[in-house]
Amino acid sequence: MNSWTGLSEQAAIKSRQEHGANFLPEKKATPFWLLFLQQFKSLVVILLLLASLLSFVVAIVSGLRSNWNFNHDLIIEWVQPFIILLTVFANSLIGSIQEFKAQKSASALKSLTKSFTRVFRNGELISINVSEVVVGDIIFVDAGDIIPADGKLLQVNNLRCLESFLTGESTPVDKTIDSNEKATILEQTNLVFSGAQVVYGSGVFQVEAVGIKTQVGKIAKTVDDSVTKLSPLQQKLEKIGKWFSWFGLGLFAVVFLVQTALLGFDNFTNNWSIALIGAIALVVAIIPEGLVTFINVIFALSVQKLTKQKAIIKYLSVIETLGSVQIICTDKTGTLTQNQMKVVDHFCFNSTTQTDLARALCLCNNASISKDANKTGDPTEIALLEWKDRSQLDLKTYYRVYEKAFDSIRKLMTVVVQKDNRFIVIVKGAPDVLLPLCNNVQNEVKNIENLLDQSAGQGLRTLAVALKVLYKFDQNDQKQIDELENNLEFLGFVSLQDPPRKESKEAILACKKANITPIMITGDHLKTATVIAKELGILTLDNQAVLGSELDEKKILDYRVFARVTPQQKLAIVSAWKEAGFTVSVTGDGVNDAPALIKSDVGCCMGITGVDIAKDASDLIISDDNFATIVNGIEEGRKTFLTCKRVLLNLFLTSIAGTVVVLLGLFILGQVFKTNLLQQGHDFQVFSPTQLLIINLFVHGFPAVALAVQPVKEKLMVGSFSTKNLFYNRQGFDLIWQSLFLSFLTLLFYSLGIIYAINNRDLQTSGDLINRAGSTCGFFILGASAALNSLNLMVDKPLLMTNPWFFKLVWIGSLASILVFLLIIFINPLGLVFNVLQDLTNHPVLISYSFGGVILYMGMNEVVKLIRLGYGNI
């Protein structure tokens, strides 16, 4: 590559001070207060606010009736709407905090995926952050780059840029160094614009505008990367939440009318408020208030964990899809291998010397190594520069006048360099492509191919080089350009070693255990790919490897290694697996990988070697370019989905059980104990709305967070894994019987508590005290059982047969929730607020009922697990 002087560091600093920095103002983040207000658009929140409003109405009416005599009942009625409001605000606060963090994460993602560009400074080509580009800089770009600033071209080599974001035209623009005074600025082919994609060739330009002074800055067209994508699970939960809400609203109306009728219209002025409170309790019981909030928190925690593990997730939804990946189409170089290229062997043809071979490979090269050993460019080209002492190659006497960039279809790179009055055409690329273009190897082709096979058989990459000399060259002569890569003289080839990563073999084995099929797609020689694939365990049979040129699209699913593949073939491979119903992940780092990355379910771009276009097309950026990181991401995706299911099962358990208890309590037990409970006009609902809110939101909070951070003991990477079904393997059946059994226990001990109170001299004087005695038992049983149910969900075998230390975080979360209940029922001020019996310590029978119900629930689960353990999957 020709050298340009560029700016000095002092000149760059001065230019930045004069013309500004190279960045566009980011889209203004939504302020926290607005995020908080947006939470109130949710149907669930609206229903809870309505419940709170109606509770206020009941409290006001009760106050008017009692002449504002704030006895126990009136205090409870006034506290209740505030508790509902507190719950709504707490839930909304958690949601808004999560969205605020998501905004920050989107901003952090931009900093984690910073773009770099190559610039000439002080006569050296170096890599700098795009934001450090200044007016006057001389920039080098090639295929895959994003133009970092507006500028005028100084040199082009078949440069084509996609500028559709400015012009609306989807066809790439051929760039020249010639200006057209009659054309508009956007039609000037000698100009490049910030944000344009280089889809072919290379070029050098001088920066004329940066930041907001660029064309894209003037029209304020900023790209917002923080797009919100909902995963299939999140979409299901939104629908479930709406269904619960509408169902709850319908039941609210029915229950209010039916209960009013049961209580009697003759005393409607008193009975309507009792019926209304019962209907409100039912709505609160049905709606799983923490549904979306808990799941979003779990997803966010997983994203943070993966970021620390070098996997940068663009969208929360990617986590779930990762967990269901069945096919990984991976590159070889840099992903499965170390990407630490080194020339380990060479072959010089005829009279070619090592110096001739090295010089040709350095001249046909776009990498650079600065004086302070900073390396810029493709690892293969850097390895070629490092092979020999460049100071002995006399490279500065050659001046590049033309370049035909490498592409994955031709598999060649061509440059024309001038020395004195000679123009030397140098072509490097795949040996099997280059040899037929040479006219001096007719009788030696077989011998050369044998040598190449020997190198490939050792897992080495081979790169050949050839040249020819011209005494006249005109890059505007299309006929001469078309003939550049013909009638060449073969110089020889080099063999490069890029050993597999140590962790790749373990990751491949992990994939196979998890029923994930790893597939290698590479541009390398078939034998080289086969050797590496066998070493890593990807390939077991030779007939599972195929050349792209020999690929039969009907048999794509039969192969595990694809060599010498074009971008179109890579896209066809991905499409074939997707059409067969598989969830496919693809890795890529080049501009030509973008279609396959977009087509796949999870596109993974390499963070180190990946070009900007590939990063834009991907869902996940692997910042260490390591295949094992993808496998870690899949495992985390599986864990996240499993955790979400456990949290949902627990939420649905209390929603179903709570709804059954409230309904049966209103229409059956209420009638059974009507005489006792209606003394002094008191209602007879099993639970108050505030008790149900504590169970549905706060009690689930501790176990939900614990489940999210607790390492799982399941062998997640053994066997297939599906995220299509929310519940499977008995889970739906278990949810139903557990909910009904818990409902039965809650109602049973509620009834026993009432019977005890009726027969107790201290309690029988008040219908309210009688109801609270039963309600306290039911409240503790439902809440504590739900808290401990998180432990049930962790293992299929009885808890008594497991080591508690394995799930210590879930134990802590569950016990923390139970502690909340104990505080409520044993501390008088809290008991008053949540309508439980205040002097519970004086009634050990009720305490035994409360703990007995929980023990029976957990005991039944242990018995069922024990039976299944002994008699198989029933």
From Swiss-Prot:
Catalytic activity as recorded in UniProt: ATP + H2O = ADP + phosphate + H(+)
Database matches in NCBIfam families: ATPase_P-type
Membrane protein topology class: Multi-pass membrane protein
EC number: 7.2.2.-
UniProt superkingdom: Bacteria
One Gene Ontology biological process: monoatomic ion transmembrane transport
Gene Ontology CC terms, in alphabetical order: membrane; plasma membrane
Principal localisation: membrane
Record-listed Mg(2+) binding positions: D589, D593
Residues in compartment: Extracellular: 63-79, 258-275, 665-687, 750-770, 827-844
Protein name: Probable cation-transporting P-type ATPase
Transmembrane annotation, as ranges: 42-62, 80-100, 238-257, 276-293, 645-664, 688-708, 727-749, 771-790, 804-826, 845-865
Gene giving rise to this polypeptide: pacL
Annotated organism of origin: Mycoplasma genitalium (strain ATCC 33530 / DSM 19775 / NCTC 10195 / G37)
Family: Belongs to the cation transport ATPase (P-type) (TC 3.A.3) family. Type II subfamily.
Catalytic residues (positions): D331
